[in-house]
Structures are given as C-alpha cells and as structure tokens.
C-alpha cells in the first residue's frame, strides 16, 4: 500500500497563522543617524511599516543627568533601553533657568529715592531735607538766618487803683483819655437779644425775621459746637437804636416756629 503523502497546508492558512504576529522593530546606526523600523496596524486593520530617522548628537551633561538616564525603568517601560522612548515620550526644547539677583531692583529703588531728594529743601540751611528734621533747628545758626523783627513798643505796666483792688485788662483802657470801656470797640446800645429760638433756627431764618424792621450791621446765632444746632438765642445789631426798640416791641411775645420769642436789650458783658 503506497505511503500517504503528507498533507500540506495551503497559503491561505499560512497567512491566517502569520496575521496575528508583527516583525520585531529594528535599529540601524550609520553615518551619525539612527534608523528605527517598526510594524503596526492602522485604523483599517492593515499592517503598515513605520521608519523613523534620528540624528545622533553628543552633549556634555553633568554627572547627575547622566546617572538619571541610566535609572532602571518600571511598568510598561521596564524593557525599554536607557533614554527616552519615542513611543511614550516626546522630547521638547530645553528650558534653561536663569537666576536674577535683586541688584537691579535695588538700583531702581535707589534711583527713585535720588529723584525725591530734590523735592525737599530746608528753609534753615537749604539742605535736601525737610525743615522739621534740620539738625540746625533751634541753634544759633537758625537765629542768625532769621529775619530781623521790628521791635514793638512795650505796653504800659498794669496799674492798680489806690484802693489796692485788681483792675482787669478790659477795664484798664477805660481809664485812658479817648478810650471807651468796650473791649471789642463795638456799640452794644443798638443790640438786642432774641431767646427761646428753636434748634432748627438758621441764619437765613433770623435774617428773614428782622430784615423788615430795619437795617442791621451784624447778626450772631449761637450754635452748639458738637451738634451744630441752635442754642436757643441770637444777637442782632441794628444801625439805629430806634429800629432796635421797634424790634423789641414787635417781636417780644411773638410766636415763631411754635415758640414764644423773648426779645430784650443786649446786656454788656462788662458793665461799668
């Protein structure tokens, strides 16, 4: 009986068997270049060949960088060769760090201070500083720079009466010929005092109240220093005593802003 011939597989079966494996990548180094050939499947599930060409350059680097390149890799890259793997690592341009000192900033601040020196000028020694911080302040140098002051005639010494009583300064001028007893030199004989005014009283309201009676020379509305409200009284100086008497006659007992006004002659502050 003749021997059975060995059954050989067809070419289609061989292609089917080889379709699941890819050739291993190859590297060729020549003329300062490294040529890497790889095989992979594209989107259409077709086998393609990828060829990458790298230019080999040699750089002098510190020992620490060279040691880091020889570190053992781990994970999916445990079998990779030393250096970056082009499939997983993209090498970009080197970034060099430059450490700048603060000398430039200090120089800029010094220039700014130098420009401010010309602003301040001392009036005592004409130096480049304020007069308040002048080292010659209160010394003989400042006294020599001061302008001469015209001497003022000294006033007469305060006199005392024969009875030995103290005479206030406001009453001393009344003893001199031609001098009145009013310290402020005003005529209070035409002044009236209006009291019982409301807190909301203003100078405009006071002007409206007395302007129809007669011309006046001055008005004073007393106000509180803290609140600024009216204290309840005011003074009006008329130009004639007749107008002042008419104002007392008309306004005394007159109702204004729900209050009854009290108007009388202004009493002198220092009666003789």
Curated annotation (Swiss-Prot):
Q: Which coarse location class applies to the principal site listed for this UniProt protein?
A: cytoplasm
Q: List the disulfide bonds.
A: none
* Gene Ontology CC annotations of this record: eukaryotic 43S preinitiation complex; eukaryotic 48S preinitiation complex; eukaryotic translation initiation factor 3 complex
Write out the entry's keywords from A to Z. Answer: Cytoplasm, Initiation factor, Protein biosynthesis, RNA-binding
Write out the GO MF terms. RNA binding; translation initiation factor activity
The RRM domain covers which part of the protein? 190-268
Stretches the record annotates as Disordered: 1-28, 157-188
Against SUPFAM superfamilies, the record matches this protein to:
RNA-binding domain, RBD (SSF54928)
Where is this gene product found? Cytoplasm
Q: What Pfam families does the database record attribute to this sequence?
A: eIF3g, RRM_1
Domain of life of the organism encoding this protein: Eukaryota
Q: Which family does it belong to?
A: Belongs to the eIF-3 subunit G family.
Please identify the protein, giving its name as recorded.
Eukaryotic translation initiation factor 3 subunit G
Provide the species name. Aedes aegypti
């Amino acid at each position: 009986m003749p021997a059975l011939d060995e059954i050989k597989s067809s070419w289609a079966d061989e292609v089917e068997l080889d379709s699941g494996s890819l050739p291993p990548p190859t590297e060729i180094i020549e003329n300062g270049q490294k040529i890497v050939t790889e095989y992979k499947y594209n989107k259409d599930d077709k086998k393609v060949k990828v060829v990458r060409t790298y230019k080999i350059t040699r750089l002098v680097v510190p020992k620490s960088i060279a040691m880091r390149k020889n570190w053992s890799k781990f994970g999916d890259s445990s079998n990779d060769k030393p250096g970056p793997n082009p499939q997983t690592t993209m090498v970009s341009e080197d970034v060099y760090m430059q450490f700048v000192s603060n000398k430039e900033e200090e120089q800029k601040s010094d220039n700014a201070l130098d420009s401010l020196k010309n602003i301040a000028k001392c009036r005592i020694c004409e130096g480049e500083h304020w007069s308040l911080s002048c080292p010659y302040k209160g010394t003989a140098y400042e006294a020599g720079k001061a302008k001469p002051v015209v001497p003022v005639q000294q006033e007469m010494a305060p006199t005392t009466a024969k009875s030995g009583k103290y005479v206030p300064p406001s009453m001393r001028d009344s003893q001199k010929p031609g001098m009145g007893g009013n310290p402020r030199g005003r005529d209070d004989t035409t002044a009236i005092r209006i009291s019982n005014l409301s807190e909301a009283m203003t100078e405009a309201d006071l002007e409206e109240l007395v302007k129809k009676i007669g011309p006046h020379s001055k008005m004073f509305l007393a106000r509180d220093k803290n609140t600024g409200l009216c204290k309840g009284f005011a003074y009006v100086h008329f130009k004639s005593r007749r107008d002042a008497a008419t104002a007392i006659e008309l306004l005394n007992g007159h109702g204004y802003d729900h209050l009854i006004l009290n108007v009388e002659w202004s009493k002198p502050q220092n009666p003789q």
